[in-house]
Amino acid sequence: MKIAMVGSGYVGLVSGACFADFGHDVVCIDKDEGKIESLRQGVMPIYEPGLAELVAANVKAGRLSFSTDLAASIEDAQAIFIAVGTPSRRGDGHADLSYVYAVAQELAENLKTPAVIVTKSTVPVGTGDEVERIIRESGTAVRFEVVSNPEFLREGAAIGDFKRPDRIVIGAEDEWAQGVMKEVYRPLFLNRAPILFTSRRSSELIKYAANAFLATKITFINEMADLCEKVGADVQDVSRGIGLDNRIGAKFLHAGPGYGGSCFPKDTLALLKTAEDYNSPVRLVEAVVKVNDSRKRAMGRKAIEALGGEARGKRVALLGLTFKPNTDDMRDAPSIAIVQTLLDAGAEVVAYDPEGMEAAAAIMPEVTMAPNAYAAIEGADAIVLVTEWDAFRALDFARIRRLANAPVMVDLRNVYDPAEVCAAGFEYTSVGRP
């Protein structure tokens, strides 16, 4: 089957490479000539474990190609995916759908053969209706159906998530469109991956509801962590104790500095805007957004408290900048607010991240980027572990004691055993643990 993937960013590139690996003939399309040329040369625009190798293998096999020419690329494609960005619109938090609608207009002008048009981008309820209207109003006589197929990929584990999904959600009620989508996902269908067919609007809402629920779990355990600190309980024990209940589950119950990234902040705001537009407020999600925003700054204040309440003139080493490990994504990363809180208090900040420093340097120019963790730690009055990269899970504390100006560690991801770190002679602060 020929598949056209419009948009070669994170979702489009991962999805396109995985579809090609399934045996489909895939062309990834993007207006950015520089990006397409780089992809042709094997240079990835993002860091995702295994992606460069997957792309190279499928390009070599002749199943994956890249183009800036949408009209030529969609010719004879049976499925055309829209995988362009939907960033938060400035001012109101609604998803900016201008890129999606621009693609719909271009498809309307160039569609020559029957195709199922699939919105892979995360879009608010009713977007598929508008995409369909744009194309139908062009007067095209070519058969097409608009389908919703949201992605549920985790950055850092996207390839595994795509190939071994918990479920595949497809918003399509037309029998022909359902048949095309079954063929698209045939390898997973044969492996008995759950495929849920719903209405298009239900599919669009499922994506937002899922992300809002996960954001709620994260925020809940973070608030429990704060309570644990007050009452002398251990949030990790609390998390295990409730997570063993099958009705709750253990995932997303790890206390930390709050959620960030390209999905949860954007999607919770978009859901709130949709709820407002339909006069059906979701107060729980409103509270989640508010609590999470305040938490990031609170983690900066926690670091200042570990410094004795005074950060002016102090040197703070940050380990990890990206919103999670195994990605270079700095979007809405907790480190941004933590750094700003420290800088506002007069601290000097030195940081190291295995993959995120290039992106971080552009948004936090006042921060000194170190070549490795130990270089960041040298002369530091406090060490703040922000992102739980594997590279930070086995630090040499004897070496750190020699390098650091003061043995103070703030572990915002609860990576270490408090007794172990204290035994090494450190003043140790973690999240939600006595």
Model-inferred region functions:
Residues 1-434:
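Structural/interface elements that position substrates and couple domains in central-metabolism enzymes
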